[in-house]
Structures are given as structure tokens and as C-alpha cells.
Amino acid sequence: MSPSPSRGALSALLATILIWAYSWVVMKQVLAYAGPFHFAALRYLLGAAVLFAALLLSRQSLRPPPLLPTLLIGLCQTAAFQGLEQWALLDGGAGHVALLAYTMPFWAVLLAWLLLGDRPTARHWVGVGLAAIGLACIIEPWHDMGSALSTTLAIAGGAAWAAGTVLSKRMFHRHAPPVLNLTAWQMLLGGMALGLLALAVPERAIEWNLAFTAGLIYSVLLASSLAWWLWSIVLQRLSTTVASVSSLGVPIVSVLLAWLILHEQPSAMELVGIVFVLLGLLAVSGVGARRRG
């Protein structure tokens, strides 16, 4: 891998972490004004519209990538992941749900090994182990984890995202679709599935006000359209292990933002866990190894 693509992927990863970290706070706030499935469907259908507009403006092809794998990616990565996490946020704190959702890397590492032959190195296993210890310290499964339903939904959403991540990586390996094209089509298909779910599940009417509209705009333009496009770039250029474990930066920043904005104060154990996760990220990224080299 040349330095330039790698640097571009790392820049995309950093931007994605910052955008998604704040989006958990936004999602928690907007659910005071809308049901989880209606909001998720709106967010992703509008996000897909933005991406298709970007395709038109950049004069890229609107022809869909291979339909079945694109549909599977959309169902896992958009419909299942976002639907389950939005549902979990109804009873769970933003920081806590974000942390449970980011069990994703551990599922992704195993799925990538089984389905892609992307076998982790010894350094990767060390990083995964440190991050797992950190996540356990943050979640504290030996204590009351709050709503059992919220916890289960958040973890299931993380597993669905892992499946979408590995399927996306396999799509890039086998078919090499343009990143923006794949992101737009999987978001449209996943958003349509969320739309059908929103129609089938009775929910409160959306309360259209300034707070909801501002949250929806952030979610559509940044957290959906821009961030998922950047995430696809990351998956295209980095290994599944490095990309997925590095995404643990999102819940770390999310916990800190939830502390500052929603007053969900982290415990001492959560702060210890954050340190372990950061050590795991350093191990997986190989920063120290590159410097010694």
C-alpha cells in the first residue's frame, strides 16, 4: 500500500470518528421528537438522495453495483444496524448504547478471518485483546447493565454492522465498485427497508421543530452521507482488522461528548477502559512499530 492512499484512509477515518461520535448525542436528542424507525428511515432515505445527487454532479455512473451483495450490505449495515441502535437509544444512554454498538470490531475480526481469510497478525491480536479489556471495563457487564432489551439490541446492531463491514470488504475485493456508487446504493436499499419497517410499526408522530430539524440535517448530511462515504473509503484501503478496531475511537469520543452535553458522567472504571482501548488502537495501528522501523 502506498503512503498516499494510507494517509488518505487515516484522514477519512479520523473525520468519520469525529462525525459519528457527535451523532450519538444528536440521535439521543432527536428521539425526544420522533420514533426510532421513522427517524432512521428519514435519515437514510434523505442521505441516499444526497449521495445520488453527488453522483450526478460528479458525472459518475448511476448503474448499481452487483445487486444481491449490495442489498445484503444495505440490510446489515444500514437497516439492521441503524434500526436496532435507534431502538436501543429509547431506553439506553447515548454513551452506553454507543459502547455496546462498538462490539462490532470483535465480530468483524472473526468474520473477516472466516469469510475473507484476513487473518490477524500477533500485533493485531494484542490490540484486540487490549481493546476488549477496555470495552469490558467501560461496559462493566458484572454490574447492572440497565435495560436488558436495550443492551441486547445494541449488541445485535453491532454484530449486524460487522457483517456489513465484511460484506463491503468482500465487494471491494471481488467487484471493485466506485466507493460513492456503492455507498449510495446500499444506503438507498437499506433506507427502503427501514421505510417499510417504519410503516409497519406504530410510532408517535414526528414533532417538527427547530431541534429535530437541526438534528436531522446533521444526521443526513454529515453522519449519513459524508461519514458512510468516508467509511467506505476506509474499508477499501485498510484491512478489516485495522479499520474495525480503529473505529473504537467513536465510542471513546462519544462518551466524552455525552458527559459534556448530556451530563452522562463516566465512572472511574470507564476512564480506565478508555485508556485500554486507546492502547489497543495504538497496537493495531502499529504506530510504535513504524517509529522503531
Give the role of each language-model region.
Residues 51, 108-110, 146-202, 216, ...:
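Transmembrane alpha-helical segments that form core, pore/gating elements
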Residues 51, 111, 120-140, 158-159, ...:
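Hydrophobic transmembrane alpha-helices of multi-pass small-molecule transport proteins
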